[in-house]
């Protein structure tokens, strides 16, 4: 039997599914996954990959409100993309992202994510591009430049019609802003 993919809203996840998700994220990120990171994972849509009843892959799409230069936009922000170690390099991550693209296309003006160096190749393969514009984050009521994040944030739009050199301003949240 193959891998089964399910799309669910956080409100539809059972306690045991949330616990399995947390365990997968801690393992997949080798312990470098904070409580803030987990909070960022909740409150939106999840695409989950199962091998029978075992959760082996996950990605979340969370609604965020940002600005593209001076224009407010609704963003589907990708969080907590992970595939269990023994299931990697089998196309599961690609399938998770293809389904993510469909959700973003139907619900948001733009898709964004903060990619690890290892993840960029996968995201490029499903149409995501490095954001070339300046990045800003809200800190104590003022926007400051997120220089350390530049080159790691990627964007995707179904029709491709977005200026990837425009400045992006992200909303405020606990933990990492991007």
Curated annotation (Swiss-Prot):
Keyword Acyltransferase: yes
Acyltransferase among keywords: yes
Catalysed conversion reaction: gentamicin C1a + acetyl-CoA = N(2')-acetylgentamicin C1a + CoA + H(+)
Annotated N-acetyltransferase domain residues: 8-171
Enzyme class: transferase
CDD domains: NAT_SF
Molecular function in Gene Ontology: aminoglycoside 2'-N-acetyltransferase activity
Domain of life: Bacteria
Binding site for substrate: 32, 79-80, 114, 148-149
Enzyme Commission code(s) on record: 2.3.1.59
UniProtKB keywords: Acyltransferase, Antibiotic resistance, Transferase
Subunit note: Homodimer.
Family: Belongs to the AAC(2')-I acetyltransferase family.
Protein name: Aminoglycoside 2'-N-acetyltransferase
Organism: Providencia stuartii
